[in-house]
Structures are given as C-alpha cells and as structure tokens.
Amino acid sequence: MSNSQVTPETLSEYLAHLPMTAEQRAELAGCTSFTELHERLSSSTFDAPTDAAQASVGRRLTLNTAEELQDAEMLVLDASGRVCLKATPPIRRTRVVPEPWRTNILVRGWRRLTGRSNPPAPPKDERVLPAARWRTVGSIRRYILLVLMLGQTIVAGWYMKGIMPYQGWSLVDFDEIRNQTLLQTATQVLPYALQTSILIMFGILFCWVSAGFWTALMGFLELLTGHDKYRISGKSAGDEPIPKDARTALVMPICNEDVPRVFAGLRATFESVAATGDLDRFDFFVLSDSNDADICIAEQQAWLDVCREAGGFGKIFYRRRRRRVKRKSGNLDDFCRRWGGDYKYMVVLDADSVMSGECLTSLVRLMEATPDAGIIQTAPRASGMDTLYARMQQFATRVYGPLFTAGLHFWQLGESHYWGHNAIIRMKPFIEHCALAPLPGKGAFAGSILSHDFVEAALMRRAGWGVWIAYDLPGSYEELPPNLLDELKRDRRWCHGNLMNFRLFLVKGMHPVHRAVFLTGVMSYLSAPLWFLFLVLSTALLAVNTLMEPQYFMAPRQLYPLWPQWHPDKAVALFSTTIVLLFLPKLLSIILIWAKGAKEFGGKFKVTLSMLLEMLFSMLLAPVRMIFHTRFVLAAFLGWAATWNSPQRDDDSTPWGEAIKRHGTQTLLGFFWALLVVWLNPSFLWWLVPIVGSLMLSIPVSVISSRVGLGLKSRDESLFLIPEEYNPPQALLSTDKYTHENRWHALNDGFVRSVVDPQQNALACALATSRHAQAEPIEYLRAERVRHALKVGPAGLNNGERLALLSDPVALARLHEQVWSEGHAEWLAAWRESIKADPHAPLLPLQPLSSQAQPA
C-alpha cells in the first residue's frame, strides 16, 4: 500500500480520462496523492490508503451517467457498504432439480423381474396432453409417412438387387465351403458379401433420402395451397392485448462471442419490442459464460452503453457466471433457478439472433391462446452475411428451408422439434421437467448433454405439453457461419451432441415422435460414414470383379455356369429415381417462388440461375462434408474431445494455409482414389468423378467461397438474393447499423483498461460479484493477488488470474490505486499503448460540454 506523492503530469493524465469540466479538473489538480484524490471524489477519508479507490467507484462511474443511473436506481451498496451496479433483478430462487437418467433398459427390466422398484422420482405436476383431433391426425400422417418411406425403399432395394452382377446366395454351397482353403472360400464368397453389404448400405441411405423427399413434398403442398387447419399461428387473432401476468424473459446465453454484434442484435430486438407498446411485458437478460477477461470487460461496457443509449436500465440485465457448469443448458438452469419464477414465458435467443417486436408479441399471444403448448418454435431466416459461401447457404435455407419446415410441421404437428433458440417456452413446466441431469457412466457419451434442445423438447412432450413449429411466423432471424470450415467446427459439436442424445432413445416415457427425432439426429451425421462405406464397398466390388477370376461354377456337379448379370434398364431407372428424390425438392421450391412472386429473389431467371449454381456448389461440397462428418463420428466413438468454442459470427475468409491444413488429406485421398479406379477400370471413373473431383478441388473451393468480394459481387448481380437483402426489415437494418457503430468504438484490451483506466476500473469494480466480508484469509489472498499482478505486469498474468481479479472489487480497486500511485511502468505503458492503437476510441480528454456551451 502506498500513499506516495503524485507528480502533476501523472495526476493530469489521470484526470484527463475522467469526464469532468475544466473547473472540476482544476479543483482536483492540487491533490498531493491519489489517496487524497479518491477521498475528495468520494467525499470520505480512510485509514487504509488503498480503500479510497474502492470508495470512489460510485463517483467515478456516475460522472457522465449520473442521471440515467439514479433514475433507474441502479447504484446500491452491498453488505460491506461497497458500491455495486444493479445489473440483475433481485433473486427469487426456484427449485430446479434434474431427474437422473435411467438409460439402461436391461437394468430396468432386471429390477422389474426381481421385484425391485426403481428409485422414486421427485413429485412433479404431471399432466396428460388433452385429447385433440390433431393428435389422431398426426399419428395417421406418420403411419402414412412410414409406409411411403418403406415402400419406396423396398422397391428401390429390389431394383438395386437386380443390378448386382451376382444374384443371391442360393448357389453357394456352404457344406462345400467347409472343405475348401481360406483363399478358395474368399474367392467364392467375397463378391456376394460385398454385394450384400452394399445393398444394406443402399437401403438405409435410400430410406433417409426418401424421408426428406416426402417431407419437402408435403411442405410444398402446404405452402402452395395455404390451407393448414392445424397451424399453430392460426390460434390467435394477432391483436388482442397481452395480459399483465404474461411476463416474458428474453434470455441470450453467450460465451466468448463477437461483442459488438451480440449487443447490436440485442438493441435492435429491444427497440423493436418497444415500438409495439408492450415493452413492459418483457425483460432482457444477457447470460454470459465468457471466460476471456478482455471479452468480459467488453461485455460489461457494451451492456452499459446499450442501456444508456436505448433506455434499457431496469429492462436489460447482464449476468456473468463464475462457475461454468453444463455449458448452455447449465446457463439456462441457473437463470431459471434465480429468476425463472418471476416470468410466465421465456424466449431463448442465440448470440446472433434478432427477432422483431411483432414476432415476439405474436408468440406470447399464441402461448396465451394455446394453454397446452409448452414450446413454440419459430423458423429463423438466415441473413446478414456477405461471403459467397454464406450467401449461397442463406439462399438455400431461405428458398428450400420453408418446404422442409412446413413438412416437418405437417408430419409432427404438436410433437415437433425445438432448435434451442428463437422459440418461446412456458416457464413453469420447463423448470419442473426440462432440467438436464448428466448422462451416467464414463467416456465420450457420458456427462453433460451437449445438444440440449432436442432433449428438452422430448421432456416437455413427455410431461404432457405440446411442442409446435410456427413455420409461417415472420420476424425471426439468425446468421450462418461465414465459411465452410467454421460450419464444420459447429458440425463437430452437433455431431457429438446428437450421438450422445441417442442414449436417451429407450428412456421410459419418451413419445415415439421424439424417439424418431433422436434417430434422425444421429442419421444426420451417421449417414456420412454410411455413404463413405457404400462408396468404398463399391470400389472394392469393382476391384474384385476386375482382379479376381469369376467363379462360374459354385457347386459340385453344377451343369450350367453362373453368369454375372447386368441390367442397364434397371440401373438407369434407379439412378433417375434417386436424382428425382434428391433434386425435386429444390425444383419445387423454385416453382413455389414463381407462383408466389420472384421479385424479391431477383426475378424468375435469376432465382432459377441461383438454384442451378447452388446445386452445383452443393454437389462440390457434399463429398467434403462426407469425409469431415465421417471423421467426426469416428472421433466421437474414439473419445476425442469436442471443443465448445463459439463459432465465427463475422464475415471471415479462409486463408490458403488453413485450407491446405484442413483439406490436404481429402485432396490426396481423392487423387489416389481416382488413380486406383483408373487402374482398375477407366470407364468406371465417370461414375466416381463427382466424388473424387470434389475432394481434389476442396482446397480452392473452400478458400474462394469464403471471399467477401465474390459474395458482394454476386449480390450486385442479384444472384443468391433473398427478400431480407432486397427489402431488409427494420430489425435487420438496425442490427447492421448498430454493429457498425459498436465496432467503431469497440473496447479492446479490456482487462488492462479495467485495471488502469479510471472509468473502466469503476465499472469493473461495480459489476464484480465476489463480495466477501472482511476476513483475514481473504485479505491475505487479495494482497497476494495484487502483489503478484504488480510484480509480473499484465503480460505475466494468465487468464485465470485475470478473472480472479475481475471478480474481486476490493483487489481490483487496490491494484488500480497502486498502479497509479506507485507509477508501475508496465501497466501504464500497456494502457497507453492500448489507447494509442485504438483509432476509434473516444477523443481525449473526455470533457463534457459546459452548461454555457450546451446547445439549446
């Protein structure tokens, strides 16, 4: 601790970074020490010099925000009399108890056989979803879908069997095989084993493609006719007043995100809700799990800025967890436990989500009009990105996505999907039934659930509440990854999460629809290794037919040879059918746009050309995704950890070096695979060119498609144009505007500034959450942390040490005071360099207009 004399230059520099008038600075310029300065700022005196900086936090914080903070009653004192900023509402705890999973059906069966009951579940408000016509209709529709899928697959499998050169196992004499050598057995049996494996792979994959086809077809008919008596959005008139007790919390869980973009979207959503006149029914929560000290400080400043600029004090709240348990689902659990009892509904937003006020108020009205609904999911529309890759993906989701979403609703009705964001949730049943316990056991598929959304929807339905998709409700938006590699990083997490969720397939009480959802979640990624295996087996069969002498006589005393067969007519028919199933949904999407109006998509010609280019691009990327997803599935089964880093939210180009590193193995695989096929049978290469050619081109395709310039040029040519670009809604215009403004004055080097900068330190101290009473062990730990920080400087502190300082208002204030009073060069130099390197920081000194100079 120090109370040393301060030089006029140092004092002047400190005062220059406080928003004061010249008269106020002149009055404080006579201070002989920083202790005296803080005492005069706080109008108090202290025995311990380093306590003065803590006491002046409130004064430093309110020099230019006093009126806003006082009007909203944001400044309060903690139990020790220290100033803190009321960034969250008062806590009213609610009991949130996850039910342990009993995933082993054999253990459950054994306990029943031996007369031992399972441990009793905690009492809950159980209910049964009331009988309704839509439930019967939904069941009938799903049986029809199952018949259509299986019927198509059986017919296609029969055709595929007829294409195979060796027809069945009937002429294989297994008794004779026992007396043969292993080589002779392999020579006879290997072609049949390969054919059977190929046929099995084909059946699974064709059934998967068939499900997508029928979903898109029914979605097309729903959207074309516009007649859907079971759509959830028809339950509300759309203009009835929202009851006072229908309070809704908009929660945005974030973790090391792009801070300017996050708070731009939040502000746009907030202002859109305010424009509806129903803002008093909504509160906004930013729930941070960030563990990067610089990002944490940037979040705090961004929260203060958005509250000040949008009038959000008392409506927009910010909370950062110190104990990051169970990732996003744990973050939501923590919110429900602290404040969930204060709200009837909760809308979950992703970090890149934007929702209009009309959409949000409509969701609340739909919940009020549908008392049996537990979750209503909107269909977010992708927009806001400029790279060529992202614009093609935006176009694909905007053009083809509505068919599949409407089709999902057609088959599932009130037993549908929840995608984890841009959805409204009924709070009481969610708290009682949807808390997620970790999966039992050890290994890669145990522990905290990664993909929580499907599981929460299944638990909500198991508890007797409906889960709906409001596929036709506008005003819900999200952003997509800017390039292929960022999308694949996200896919690895989703792959691991979906594979984990399949452990819940046989959990007692799950509705069959949600068991099917778990299955489709697995197939979304397991289809990749199945397709890869199908191609490998096909190549192996080619090698067998080329390199091995055909066995025309398979049985003793066989009179006639067994000739390999070839039916080109069946092959052409099967190939044509598969192409139709894959590409007809895209053509139907374009037909629907032609019928509804193609102007906002660039016109009929441009939207059709965009579809053809997107189809070509998707064909180039499909084999690349196949290889990556195969690796992800293998990695999950082998126990390789899936990191949970936040995806890139801004437009970002892929460097050549990164592309070579990630795609190099695929390029070599495609090259050697092509050489092998040419060596075996050059004519077969034409069938494999779409696969091996795409793999060999993966590096340039990945790099070129990530370019912003090409994306902007395609937009100038009205290619891949979507309505949100042609005529942007106000929420997206505001998001774009605020994102640019936030980036202009974004806070960099936040930790250094929180220690050295007078106002940033005051904000960090006011928001610090570790507010312990005075105790000798705590004081010793604080002194050690401050001493260590002064000794090693900002560069010598690891992230954990930085976070510990940010959490302790006393230690942070003491460190701030000693850095200035003792003139620690490393800290001051780092702070000055940070300000110098930031060309968009506010001009210094921060001097407000005097009362005489203020404009009228």
Curated annotation (Swiss-Prot):
GO cellular component, one term: plasma membrane
Its membrane topology: Multi-pass membrane protein
Keyword line: Cell inner membrane, Cell membrane, Glycosyltransferase, Membrane, Transferase, Transmembrane, Transmembrane helix
Gene3D superfamilies reported in the protein's UniProt record: Spore Coat Polysaccharide Biosynthesis Protein SpsA, Chain A (3.90.550.10)
Superkingdom in the source lineage: Bacteria
Classification via Pfam families: Glycos_transf_2
Protein's pathway: Glycan metabolism; osmoregulated periplasmic glucan (OPG) biosynthesis
SUPFAM superfamilies documented for this protein: Nucleotide-diphospho-sugar transferases (SSF53448)
One example of a Gene Ontology biological process annotation: glucan biosynthetic process
Entry's transmembrane regions: 144-164, 198-218, 517-537, 574-594, 608-628, 691-711
NCBIfam families: PRK05454.1-1, PRK05454.2-1, PRK05454.2-5
Role according to the record: Involved in the biosynthesis of osmoregulated periplasmic glucans (OPGs).
Family assignment from sequence similarity: Belongs to the glycosyltransferase 2 family. OpgH subfamily.
HAMAP family, sorted: MdoH_OpgH (MF_01072)
Protein name: Glucans biosynthesis glucosyltransferase H
Gene source species: Pseudomonas fluorescens (strain SBW25)
